Amino acid sequence: MANNPGALSQDDIDSLLESINSSESLSLDESLSNVISSPTGKKQKVKVYDFKRPDKFSKEQVRTVSSFHEAFARYTTTSLSALLRKMVHVHVASVDQLTYEEFIRSIPNPTTLAIINMDPLKGSAIFEVDPTIAFAIVDRLFGGDGDTIKDKSRDLTEIEQSVMESVIIRILANMREAWSQVVDLRPRFGHIEVNPQFAQIVPPTEMIILVTLEVKIGKVEGLMNFCLPYITIEPIVSKLSTRYWHSLIGVGTTSENLDALREKLENTAMPLVAEIGEVKLKVREILSLDKGDVLNLESSLINKDLTLKVGTKEKFKCRMGLMGNKVSVQITEKIGDIKGFDLLKELTEEVE
């Protein structure tokens, strides 16, 4: 067949398609800015509203969520540093609202996706740890330095998943504390997914709020993401505003506040230490201490009351003995005034 001199070649067609795509790629902001102007003739800045993905959270609510997770990041920095016995730094990189589909597309595959039940709220959330951080944590807990990650593209083994499960459960306790001002959140670990496509907790078009945390463990840097669907926190979304916080400031001390304070104090862990005795040693003796060395205490301590400390305060006298096959102490008397532990009673009297 003879070539038609007026026909377009394949290269011409490809060039036309490319030019059309490039013109369509211009943002709507740029297009509107070229046609909309003020009465004075100056161009006005126009904000685009996408009806396919309407904002569910106001800027004020996003800022409130950000402040909660700044506290969460501080708590997590402390808990992970203690767990890994290595300097860990966690901070909030961004808080955005987007569709669930966009979130799923933005994370690597494989990764570590923990499905979280957000009791007492209905629905689930996702806590994602990217492979770089997950393998650094696992390597450190297995005795490594956590800085050398050979293969980040593989799935976690069953043992490694079990280790990450315990770490995530530890982190979730920090989340409960961070959200305690608006809800008594009791996040419960559900299960781990490694393929984001299998973690369908809401429809793809559902709006979520995404908290991205930058994490540094020694020399390793990576991300953690907390995905919270709007339908999950919809019952408390009205509390994520300054109006709600101002109303709390005006309430003052009430029986409800005292109940919350009482619950906090009653669930606060306090160390109790029974001092068996003390030994004075010279510095050179301390430096030479080794496994198997014996420190001689007073023989009279066996029948002598010991001091029981609550925190750093001496509060009770006790006597050492056995309960079953365990060494135990029995409280024999209170030491002085324990009024410092009766704060709740004083507060209750003030309200009355």
UniProtKB/Swiss-Prot annotation:
Keywords noted in UniProt: Bacterial flagellum, Cell inner membrane, Cell membrane, Chemotaxis, Flagellar rotation, Membrane
UniProt xrefs under InterPro entries: CheC-like_sf (IPR028976), Flag_FliM (IPR001689), FliN-like_C (IPR001543), SpoA-like_sf (IPR036429)
Compartment list: Cell inner membrane; Bacterial flagellum basal body
Similarity comment text for this entry: Belongs to the FliM family.
Organism: Borreliella burgdorferi (strain ATCC 35210 / DSM 4680 / CIP 102532 / B31) (Borrelia burgdorferi)
Keyword set includes Nucleus: no
BP GO terms, sorted: bacterial-type flagellum-dependent swarming motility; positive chemotaxis
Keyword flag Cell inner membrane: yes
NCBIfam families: fliM_switch (TIGR01397)
GO MF term list: cytoskeletal motor activity
GO CC, any one term: plasma membrane
SUPFAM superfamilies in alphabetical order: CheC-like, Surface presentation of antigens (SPOA)
Gene3D superfamilies found in the cross-reference section: CheC-like, SpoA-like
One Pfam family per UniProt: FliM
Protein name: Flagellar motor switch protein FliM
UniProt function note: FliM is one of three proteins (FliG, FliN, FliM) that forms the rotor-mounted switch complex (C ring), located at the base of the basal body. This complex interacts with the CheY and CheZ chemotaxis proteins, in addition to contacting components of the motor that determine the direction of flagellar rotation.
Coiled coil segments of this chain: none
Disulfide bonds: none
Topology within the bilayer: Peripheral membrane protein
CDD domains assigned to the protein according to its UniProt record, in alphabetical order: FliM
